[in-house]
Amino acid sequence: MHLSKIIFLLIILFPYHVNSRKPIKYKNVNNVFIEIYPCKAIKWERKKKKRDLIKNNKLIHNVDVNYINMITNDNHISSEKCRDIKKKRKITSSEYGMSLEFFKKNPKKVVQNLKKRGMEKYLNVIVMLKKLINEKNENEVLRNKLRNRRKLLSDHIKNLIFNSKKYEDIINRDITNDSDHKTNLIHVDEEKKKTEKKNDTQDILKDNQKIRYINKENQATNNNINNQDNSNDVLKKNKIQIEEIKKETNQINKDIDHIEMNIINLKKKIEFNLYKLPNILLNKVPKGKTTEDNKIIKFYKKENIIQLNNEEYDFIEPHEEIIKKYENNFIFSNISNKIGFGYNILVNDIAKLERALIDFMINTHVNKFLYTYVKAPEIVTKSALFNTGQLPKFEEDLFKITDNYKLLNEDAYLIPTSEVSLLNLFKNSQIDYIHLPIKLVSHSSCFRTEKNNTYGKTSKGLLREHIFQKVELINITDKKTSPFYYKKLIKQSTYILKQLNIPYRLVLLNSIETPYSASICYDIEAWLPSQQRYVEVSSCSNCLDFQARRLNLKYKIKDSNNFCHTINGSGLAVGRVLAIILEQYQIKKKHKNEITKIQVPKVLRKYMNKDIIQVEYN
């Protein structure tokens, strides 16, 4: 009976035991459950995470990491455990960009990459690199041989010095003994005389023993004198050998110094030639030769595209004409003749609209997407441009400051994008893994010569300027999570266009169009009504560890140091978005000569304090 009661109690208590082991669930805004398990059941927790990761794969894409961290911190569970969820996703893309190690292991892939990018003219760089690497290796082998020879000579000198000291000690000891023996010889005659005077037989025997001992010592002294001569000869030979070895060692040191200088110069040449090679493309990048080969991923608000063949929109004014119309038209006239082609000025409400756009973009990225706002320098060193991949390929597109001006003893340039300034803030840095990702947003003027694109329809107005405004986004991540944050950055850039209600499309660039430092690149193109085409307003690139290797930017996890991955994108190009707003938000005109009025987008009205901008004619 007692046993049956125990069994009955176990049956009742078993469900409570099972429920106590179930996860605690917290519901987030996206109706996705984040599961946080009791810390005591660590082993069971890991197995459960692996299984739930497959079921709830959307969790990674829908839940913001900072939100996860906030929840986990409230429940006394470290954010690193939530990061483990991200890290366990399968990464199909490459984790490594172009590097010297990659080149040595996969020279054929580097050749294929150049051909895929249409950069066959750089194949001679590969030949040069192989030659330089072989030459460097030969020099290193020769240097190592000389070092080994120097070590052998050093050990030989030590042995010679040790032996010399040994012989010197023997000589010093023999000299001391000789002086004692001479004293003994002086007393021999005295001892003989004493024996003659003594009549005691026992005393005579003792004296004879002393005489025999003294004679024996005298014989030893004569032998020591001969040994001293031999030791002196050995010492002389050792000194000669030591001098010869020192001369040889000095020559070896000079040869090693010369070889090491050659190795340093070869490394610089290898590095310079390696800089000419672009990043390795990911497999998903389509092959192509022209922009027509780009892959269109999706459209947004395609139905809102304004078609000029529609009678309602016959009187849309191009933005390049609008920016020439100022309220204070009696002050400004013939501006283009005074400032040159490729430059624009904005006055009053249009200038305010540009500032409103910048503020809206920065506030959105800082407040909604939790970026850190950084105002970075607009003048950088030459090496900074090498680190991010603008040099050596795009030197003719950069504005170089006069040779008389130096920055950190280097040539100085105006930045083509604030990406250069932001990333170089982390040069030679090691970041703790728990601080990743680092998300930065910056607004700056950007300077480009645009030598090949300064004329024609596609370069009018705000579409292509020598100086333009841009909001830049930078993510520094670890190698496992860069694809995840890359997708997020693209969504963050497109969010701005969605808030402005501007039609756009997302385009995956083909192998020819993909930027030099990128492994993959998506362009965000918005609709420009006056030209009836999409124009690029953002270019989002994942550079993998390509830039981080040049910057020597690493993150530390446990006992290992790995190169970071860098992601960049515009969030957005201010001038082009402004041009689209000036056309997209025009209030319909009944006739061509009617005053142009522009409706301010809803999200910008709080910055402008007005709903409509009126543009007057000159």
From Swiss-Prot:
Tell me the InterPro entries matching this sequence. Answer: aa-tRNA-synt_IIb (IPR002314), aa-tRNA-synth_II (IPR006195), aa-tRNA-synth_II/BPL/LPL (IPR045864), Ser-tRNA-ligase_type_1 (IPR002317)
Output a single Gene Ontology CC term carried by this record: mitochondrion
MF terms from GO for this chain are:
ATP binding; serine-tRNA ligase activity
Cellular location of this protein? Cytoplasm
Q: Name one Pfam family in it.
A: tRNA-synt_2b
Biotech use, per record: Possible candidate for an effective malaria vaccine as determined by epitope response in sera.
Q: Which reaction does it catalyse?
A: tRNA(Ser) + L-serine + ATP = L-seryl-tRNA(Ser) + AMP + diphosphate + H(+); tRNA(Sec) + L-serine + ATP = L-seryl-tRNA(Sec) + AMP + diphosphate + H(+)
- What's the subunit arrangement here? Homodimer. The tRNA molecule binds across the dimer.
The organism is Plasmodium falciparum (isolate 3D7)
Please name the taxonomic classification of the source. Answer: Eukaryota, Sar, Alveolata, Apicomplexa, Aconoidasida
Q: What is known of its domains?
A: Consists of two distinct domains, a catalytic core and a N-terminal extension that is involved in tRNA binding.
Q: Coiled-coil segments, which residues? A: none
Gene Ontology BP, a term: cytoplasmic translation
Report what the protein is called. Serine--tRNA ligase, cytoplasmic
Identify which top EC class this enzyme belongs to: ligase
Please tell me where L-serine binds in this chain: 417-419, 472, 570
Query: Could you tell me the keywords of this UniProt record?
Result: Aminoacyl-tRNA synthetase, ATP-binding, Cytoplasm, Ligase, Merozoite, Nucleotide-binding, Protein biosynthesis
Residues the entry annotates as binding ATP:
448-450, 536-539
Functional description taken from the UniProt entry: Catalyzes the attachment of serine to tRNA(Ser). Is also able to aminoacylate tRNA(Sec) with serine, to form the misacylated tRNA L-seryl-tRNA(Sec), which will be further converted into selenocysteinyl-tRNA(Sec).
The pathway noted for it is: Aminoacyl-tRNA biosynthesis; selenocysteinyl-tRNA(Sec) biosynthesis; L-seryl-tRNA(Sec) from L-serine and tRNA(Sec): step 1/1
Give the family from UniProt. Belongs to the class-II aminoacyl-tRNA synthetase family. Type-1 seryl-tRNA synthetase subfamily.
The catalytic activity of this protein is classed by the Enzyme Commission as 6.1.1.11
